[in-house]
């Protein structure tokens, strides 16, 4: 619901695709497989997120993109969702502005899931980095995971559920 969204809100969704299942497995059965951040684009609340496989046009590539909330939470992509909020709206707005700049700069999706390289970003890394640009050392309280699955083997990964467990965020809506 667009009226519930505020600039800087962190939105989580759980999808049913192959990538979603891999993320959930990496997260030991976590509830969410994807995360984005709400930005104000000319008065319209939009979601900036880094996502593989959701292309908008022929020859599109995996990248940081911006979607309407109804597109981000499409029932074909989403089983359930949640909206989290940071208490300081000024900081949240700065994080959203940073995310919007990253979207405008055409950052591509980080298939290496490398937290130390911000030239490419995956979904959780994008939101963490946006809040870091707003002065928050780690919106996920520094939680990192080493993931060792047959198709998903990475170190120091931030998972979508880490936002859910953050002491700095409050749930404002769940569906």
Show the residue positions of the predicted features:
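Extracytoplasmic/secreted proteins, especially bacterial periplasmic and envelope-associated proteins
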Residues: 6, 31, 94-98, 122-129
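Loop/turn positions that initiate beta-strands
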Residues: 7-11
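Activation targets extended, charge/polar-rich intrinsically disordered C-terminal tails
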Residues: 111-175
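Sec/Tat-exported extracytoplasmic proteins
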Residues: 15, 39, 51, 73, ...
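Glycine-rich catalytic cores of cysteine/serine-nucleophile enzymes that process amide/ester linkages
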Residues: 13-82, 108-121
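Short, surface-exposed secondary-structure edge patches
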Residues: 1-4, 27-29
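A contiguous binding-surface segment within folded domains or other stable secondary-structure elements
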Residues: 82, 89, 93
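Residue-level detector of flexible, active-site-proximal loop/helix-junction positions
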Residues: 54, 90, 146
